[in-house]
């Protein structure tokens, strides 16, 4: 179990007053341009990243930030975005600039251009970028004296002007804040290294690398349309994506990962394996599961259901819609309205003249299951003897996601959450959280996901309900439980929902990608809002502590993650078809029918391929369909009451006695092995030979 790989923190160095951070780096003999661990910026005592040209007013200790760290890569990528924008305006002089932030594993920049970018355009832009990098242009920070000065300089950049005008108001995202900054309004100029003349510039907070030569490896990956500021009511711009790394080797590894990820894309595999689809007639973000996908989903849910019963959970069911008042009580309409579908106004009655005889009511599709679970808790008096009370539901919820962010099964509008709410006393709280975290980790591991780290999301000071004392107690309790697990804990300041802090279980998949999976959220607020109580041992009425928990996040998302983790080759216990019988000729179908019937009677999902394809073609087809066990039968097999095993890795074991074959398959499936079965792994041996 591990956290994301990261280099060890560098030792502090002293920057003398009146000298640059870069000079201190050189004096310390630290790596410079060209090395993967070259220092690209420094971190000051307040945690702010500073250019190497930064000159402090007083002596100060700083942390060197190298190119092979996440912060270092982010700076390189931000600078690469500037190089891209310069290249675009050189080749497309009429292009207007949007924003260009670093993102996970890369960067993008938005442009207003007359026509969408083509693959040939991206090739030309890459070539121009390489020349800019080779030129070694200097990044130079400049502070505007006033907004008016900035407006005058950027008079021909309408999107930059909009950001300048919004500087004193609410910027929409951290990407925009990166453009504008906090206390000062600044630009970064690219200077000719010989003449120091300004070549190009952009409104930007920074920081940046010293020169363009600090970008050792980059590549433009694709382009797409994107709404300005993510709002579909705004102009549609053209976005170019790219990636940049500390070395060519790191870039090559990343591109290989992208290629493999494309092969594993669950949207592609969903079609190839006939698992699910997204009919246009239903709308964006609303998947349907086909029979094979339905089998996988059923197995996912059934195993989870069984483990929850063993862990003392009680199953409930709640409706898909509710009256408005429920979400007023819960606070969702105040804090989460943007994520809810519009109200349905129903039950109104009208007179013949159209006047209202009886007012209707607003109903909402539920975005969360928790308020309905609270009503179940509140439906009768509760005693401390009933606690902890663990309510669980596979509950359908509906959330409005903008069409631009909907993505396959991992970001949908209609989903099924494996949602649990645990009500306990404060005295039980810590033990229940520790028990719950271990349950989550164990269950995820049962599905083959066992590389974890934890993230602690704390209060957003601008978006929370409840007292500061409640939040502090909840946060510290979660922190103690997370730390006691022995897993690496990463802080997420301001990342909590409005009603309480949470632990997120982050999982690394087979490609080393991180996914947020399970969430455990402590909530002292909802019991007050719903007036939840229990009778304590001394006869007094007390509020229970509430713990929210979604283990898979949603069934749909978990399905998508597992599909990519296993590249569609689900473990045999989850596979939609576990065994396929392949006859050498039609004369052998009847024998395999009997074998398949025997397997089905033992709970194995098995079938016989009776198509007109030749045997070799059938093997290829079922290998591509990721069927874990292929059983071949010819004359010798029928005569000897045997079969030949064929596996996805093309290994084969011939002449396995029928009863031994059945026992081996049943044993493998019932043990819920997550490895792909091979001749080496499955305990079978041949006693006869088909040849």
Curated annotation (Swiss-Prot):
It is found in: Cytoplasm. Zn(2+) binds at residues 370, 421, 548. Belongs to the class-II aminoacyl-tRNA synthetase family. Pfam families: HGTP_anticodon (PF03129), tRNA-synt_2b (PF00587), tRNA_SAD (PF07973). GO terms for biological process: threonyl-tRNA aminoacylation. It is an enzyme of class 6 (ligase). Binds 1 zinc ion per subunit. One of its GO terms (cellular component) is cytoplasm. The keyword Metal-binding applies. Its EC number is 6.1.1.3. The lineage of its organism: Bacteria, Bacillati, Actinomycetota, Actinomycetes, Mycobacteriales. This is Threonine--tRNA ligase. Homodimer. InterPro entries: aa-tRNA-synt_IIb, aa-tRNA-synth_II, aa-tRNA-synth_II/BPL/LPL, Anticodon-bd, Anticodon-bd_dom_sf, TGS, Thr-tRNA-ligase_IIa, Thr/Ala-tRNA-synth_IIc_edit. Keywords: Aminoacyl-tRNA synthetase, ATP-binding, Cytoplasm, Ligase, Metal-binding, Nucleotide-binding, Protein biosynthesis, RNA-binding, tRNA-binding, Zinc. Residues 265-571 are annotated as: Catalytic. It catalyses: tRNA(Thr) + L-threonine + ATP = L-threonyl-tRNA(Thr) + AMP + diphosphate + H(+). Catalyzes the attachment of threonine to tRNA(Thr) in a two-step reaction: L-threonine is first activated by ATP to form Thr-AMP and then transferred to the acceptor end of tRNA(Thr). Also edits incorrectly charged L-seryl-tRNA(Thr). Transmembrane segments: none annotated. Residues 1-66 form the TGS domain. It comes from the Bacteria. One of its GO terms (molecular function) is threonine-tRNA ligase activity.
């Amino acid at each position: 179990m591990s956290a994301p790989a990261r280099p060890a923190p560098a030792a502090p160095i002293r920057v003398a007053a009146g000298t640059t951070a870069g000079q201190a780096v050189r004096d310390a003999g630290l790596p410079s341009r060209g090395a993967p661990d070259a220092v690209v910026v420094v971190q000051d005592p307040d945690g702010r990243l500073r250019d190497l040209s930064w000159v402090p007013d007083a002596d100060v200790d700083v942390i060197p930030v190298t190119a092979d760290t996440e912060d270092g890569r982010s700076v390189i990528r931000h600078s690469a975005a500037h190089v891209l924008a310069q290249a675009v305006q050189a080749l497309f002089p009429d292009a207007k600039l949007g924003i260009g932030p670093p993102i996970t594993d890369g960067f993008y920049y938005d442009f207003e251009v007359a026509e969408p970018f083509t693959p040939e355009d991206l090739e030309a832009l890459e070539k121009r970028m390489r020349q800019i990098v080779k030129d070694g242009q200097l990044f130079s920070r400049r502070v505007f004296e006033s907004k008016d000065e900035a407006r005058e300089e950027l008079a021909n950049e309408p999107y930059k002007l909009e950001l300048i005008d919004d500087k004193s108001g609410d910027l929409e995202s951290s990407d925009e804040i990166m453009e504008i900054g906090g206390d000062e309004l600044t630009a970064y100029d690219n200077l000719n290294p010989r003449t120091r003349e300004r070549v190009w510039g952009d409104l930007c907070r920074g920081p940046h690398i010293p020169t363009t030569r600090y970008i050792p490896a980059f590549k433009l990956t694709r382009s797409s349309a994107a709404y300005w500021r993510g709002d579909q009511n705004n102009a549609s711009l053209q976005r170019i994506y790219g990636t940049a790394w500390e070395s060519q080797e790191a870039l090559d590894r990343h591109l290989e990962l992208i290629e493999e990820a494309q092969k594993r894309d669950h949207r592609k595999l969903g079609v190839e394996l006939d698992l699910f689809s997204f009919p246009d007639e239903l709308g964006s973000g609303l998947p349907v599961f086909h029979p094979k996908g339905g089998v996988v989903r059923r197995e996912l849910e059934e195993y989870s259901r069984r483990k929850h019963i063993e862990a003392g959970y009680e199953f409930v069911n709640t409706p898909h819609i509710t009256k408005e008042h429920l979400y007023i009580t819960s606070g969702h309409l105040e804090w989460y309205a943007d994520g809810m579908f519009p109200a349905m106004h129903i039950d109104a009655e009208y007179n013949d003249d159209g006047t209202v005889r009886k007012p209707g009511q607003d109903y909402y599709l539920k975005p969360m299951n928790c308020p309905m679970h609270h009503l179940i808790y509140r439906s009768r008096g509760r005693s401390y003897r009933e606690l902890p009370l663990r309510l669980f539901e596979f509950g359908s919820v509906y959330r409005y996601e903008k069409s631009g962010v909907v993505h396959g099964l991992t970001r949908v509008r209609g989903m099924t959450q494996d949602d649990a709410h645990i009500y306990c006393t404060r005295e039980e709280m810590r033990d229940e959280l520790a028990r719950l975290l271990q349950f989550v980790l164990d269950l995820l591991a049962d599905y083959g996901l066992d590389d974890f780290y934890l993230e602690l999301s704390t209060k957003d000071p601008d978006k929370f309900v409840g007292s500061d004392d409640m939040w502090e107690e909840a946060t510290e309790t979660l922190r103690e439980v997370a730390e006691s697990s022995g897993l690496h804990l990463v802080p997420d300041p301001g990342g909590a929902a409005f009603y309480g802090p949470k632990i997120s279980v982050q999982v690394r998949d087979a490609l080393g990608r991180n996914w947020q999976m399970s969430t455990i959220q402590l909530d002292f607020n909802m019991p007050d809002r719903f007036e939840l109580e229990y009778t304590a041992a001394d006869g007094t009425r007390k509020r229970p502590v509430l713990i929210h928990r979604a283990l898979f996040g949603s069934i749909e998302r978990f399905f998508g993650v597992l599909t990519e983790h296993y590249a569609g080759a689900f473990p045999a216990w989850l596979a939609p078809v576990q065994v396929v019988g392949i006859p050498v000729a039609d004369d052998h179908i009847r024998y395999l029918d009997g074998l398949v019937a025997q397997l089905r009677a033992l709970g194995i999902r098995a079938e016989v391929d009776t198509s007109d394809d030749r045997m070799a073609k059938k093997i290829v087809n079922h290998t591509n369909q990721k069927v874990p066990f292929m059983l071949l039968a010819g004359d010798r097999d029928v005569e000897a009451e045997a079969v030949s095993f064929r596996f996805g890795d093309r290994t084969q074991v011939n002449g396995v006695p029928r009863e031994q074959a059945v026992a081996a398959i049943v044993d493998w499936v019932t043990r819920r092995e997550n490895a792909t079965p091979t001749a080496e792994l499955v305990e079978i041996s041949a006693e006869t030979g088909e040849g």
